[in-house]
């Protein structure tokens, strides 16, 4: 990964994912955008991302607005291997966005988590789609 290389595993239907992408772009980066719902996942890809982000398949499982409940993946007896298999078959099961930068890999929920992965931020003020301010007029992070 080069110095300014950023990869975002993005779902354009997700407000949090759109906010994170907008933050990255407003900071002057040109990220590689991977629409994982369209492109899908491989097991090695997911295992690598989860290891780098200190996630497990269960902790990365999207439990709302996904087929997780219908697939009985919310039961405590379901193994990480079973969840991983389901994520490969149903990419929407992976929570998003996952962002990779030279500073690390994170599941960026809430959106402002991405700031920890960026060397520089957008000039302020900067607000999410819903109007919540996350960078003030002085360029400082707003903690709520």
Curated annotation (Swiss-Prot):
It holds the Pfam family ArsC. CDD domains: ArsC_ArsC. Its EC number is 1.20.4.1. PROSITE patterns: ARSC. Gene3D superfamilies: Glutaredoxin. One of its GO terms (biological process) is response to arsenic-containing substance. It catalyses: [glutaredoxin]-dithiol + arsenate + glutathione + H(+) = glutathionyl-S-S-[glutaredoxin] + arsenite + H2O. The active site is at 14 (nucleophile). The record marks 10, 62, 96, 109 as: Important for activity. Keywords: Oxidoreductase, Plasmid. GO terms for molecular function: arsenate reductase (glutaredoxin) activity. Belongs to the ArsC family. Catalyzes the reduction of arsenate [As(V)] to arsenite [As(III)]. Does not constitute the major arsenate reductase in cells: essential only in the absence of ArsC (AC P74313). This is Arsenate reductase ArsI1. It comes from Synechocystis sp. (strain ATCC 27184 / PCC 6803 / Kazusa). The lineage of its organism: Bacteria, Bacillati, Cyanobacteriota, Cyanophyceae, Synechococcales. The gene is arsI1.
């Amino acid at each position: 990964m080069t110095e300014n290389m950023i990869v975002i595993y993005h779902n354009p239907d997700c407000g949090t994912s759109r906010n994170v992408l907008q933050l990255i772009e407003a900071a002057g980066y040109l990220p590689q955008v991977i629409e994982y719902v369209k492109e899908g996942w491989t097991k090695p890809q997911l295992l690598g991302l989860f290891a780098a982000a200190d996630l497990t398949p269960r902790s990365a499982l999207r439990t709302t607005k996904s087929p997780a409940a219908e697939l009985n993946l919310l039961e405590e007896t379901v193994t990480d291997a079973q969840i991983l298999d389901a994520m490969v078959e149903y990419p929407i099961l992976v929570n998003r966005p996952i962002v990779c930068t030279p500073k690390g890999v994170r599941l960026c929920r809430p959106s402002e988590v991405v700031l920890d992965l960026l060397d520089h931020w957008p000039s302020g003020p900067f607000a999410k789609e819903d109007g919540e301010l996350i960078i003030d007029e002085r360029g400082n992070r707003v903690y709520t």
